[in-house]
A protein has these predicted regions:
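Flavin (FAD/FMN)-binding glycine-rich loop and adjacent Rossmann-like elements that form
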Residues: 2-239
Length: 239
């Protein structure tokens, strides 16, 4: 089959100065995004089993925020809730700062194992919804009943930030993005897609995230993705 990498590669393999010393299989946090709607009345849900407000205490500046994980990223309550404001009095809840990000590596699980693991990710989002309602006073906001045709009113799938990275004909790394004209391989000449976003990893729900490289909005210029990254070097005719 197609060979691939998962997690973070070693700096010895990629020559990236922000990569870890040793490779690991730690993927980015996923998020079970929720769409809330303002019902104009108290719609606070029952307290979810195992709820712990401390896990969300510094999602924003509030009376319960004492020791934030990321002191320079504590937004106001209003900025936090309006970050994903939508039309029709709805709000997207996809909040990485002590919010509903959730760590699980689903990549090599069976279908049954994934379904079971995602129950916990959904539950974590519902705990955050309860935190918003009960601790922060957003008690008129509840899961929108007209957004997703699902029994639990949550999306069909979570927000995945990372997947397998195949072993392609070429490897595109941070150095090619940052300094495309100084590399031994002029991969920029074969680009088929462009990107324009910093290196933004979500890891704070991983237990032990403090030991990982700080990859929060590491700046890079706009870049081109070369065709060779999408063509497997092991399997003929896949693409």
């Amino acid at each position: 089959g197609v060979k691939y990498d998962v997690g973070m590669e070693s700096r010895h393999d990629t020559k990236e100065d922000i990569a870890p010393e040793e490779k690991n299989n730690i993927v980015q946090d996923i998020t079970y995004v929720a769409i809330l709607k303002d019902y104009g009345k108290d719609v606070t849900i029952p307290c979810p089993e195992g709820y712990n407000k401390d896990e969300f205490a510094c999602a924003c500046a509030s009376h319960v925020c004492i020791m934030p994980k990321e002191p320079d990223r504590v937004w106001s309550k209003d900025m936090m809730i309006t970050y994903g404001k939508l039309p029709n009095n709805k709000y997207m809840i996809n909040w990485p700062i002590e919010g509903n990000d959730y760590y699980v590596n689903l990549i090599e699980m069976t279908r049954e194992e994934r379904e079971e693991a995602l129950k916990y990710a959904k539950h974590y989002t519902m705990c955050f919804v309860y935190f918003l309602q009960h601790e922060l006073g957003f008690n008129t906001l509840g899961l929108a009943d007209d957004e997703y045709p699902t029994a639990d009113k949550l999306p069909f799938i979570p927000y995945h930030r990372e997947s397998r990275r195949i072993h392609g004909l070429v490897r595109f790394d941070l150095n090619h993005a940052c300094e495309p004209f100084r590399q031994s391989q002029p991969l920029y000449r074969t680009c088929i897609a462009v990107g324009n976003y910093p290196v933004d990893h979500h890891h704070t729900r991983y237990h032990g995230y403090e030991e990982l490289p700080n990859l929060y909005f590491h700046p890079i210029p706009s870049y081109g993705l070369p065709l060779g990254t999408l063509i497997s070097k092991d399997v003929e005719g896949l693409i």
